[in-house]
Amino acid sequence: DLNYIQNASARNLKRQMASTIGLVVRDLDNQFFSALARGVVDTAADQGVLVVLCSVDNSEQAESGNARLLRSQQVDGVIYDSGFHENARSLLELQALGPVVLVDERIPGLDLPSVVADGRRGTREIARHVVKLGHKRFACIAGPSAHWTSEQRLAGYREGLAMEGLEPDQMLIRHGDYKLESGYEIAKELMGLPKSERPTALLCANDMMAIGAMEYCRSSGIAVPADVSIVGFDDIPMARLLSPRLTTVRQPAYEMGRGAVQLLFTMTQSGPDATPPDPFAVDVVIRESTAAPRAE
């Protein structure tokens, strides 16, 4: 009896499965992305597959560096959620390594499978909820312009207003970068408008920007939700710890990470025509950061 640990790479090669995969993800300080990464790592580990993790800062140099790193590690495929896809060349470089699965985004013009949530439905429903509270002056702290996920969430907010009889073109729109600081700065601008123009509800494209907006309001003596209602998107753990707790849309980050790995494994074994899963369902979570507007 030879006591030995079977080599995972050899075992996976024997069964025609990946032995190492890459994960390109942005902003691990954001609890959504860290939960997604945990889903990827846990699911890969269940199959004895290693994950090479690359975190990016949304620059072309970082994207190219990640492609070089993953090539040097001889990964068998890549899960990609960097949010920076103006540099399509780096994605083509990644495709040369093996299958590429997008998660939480789609890229027009590139035929890449993706694992996403139904964010448009989520923002549509949460916007309708806020309108039903009596709000009429809205602003949206949207994500980066020209990003598919950001556009879907903005479209849902606009549809929700229209479904409740409001004119979506009247909603002020400012684009942030999904980080807390941009939510803070945009809220500072919006809440500094003349009172007759100031929004009574801020619809944010993610929780981090919503938290930044809430922090600006707290530091400036603006009461949430008495003076302004604020909603987010993701339902990161921090959203439940705020005071007031954040009304938001919950999307299943961990399960999306798992789904991306499962799709990648299927592609490595069966070829590139594997069918992506249907969009993951989302849930509107009503908490204390939204209420009826103050009577004028």
Identify what each model region corresponds to.
Residues 74-82, 139-141, 173, 195-206, ...:
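Periplasmic-binding protein-like
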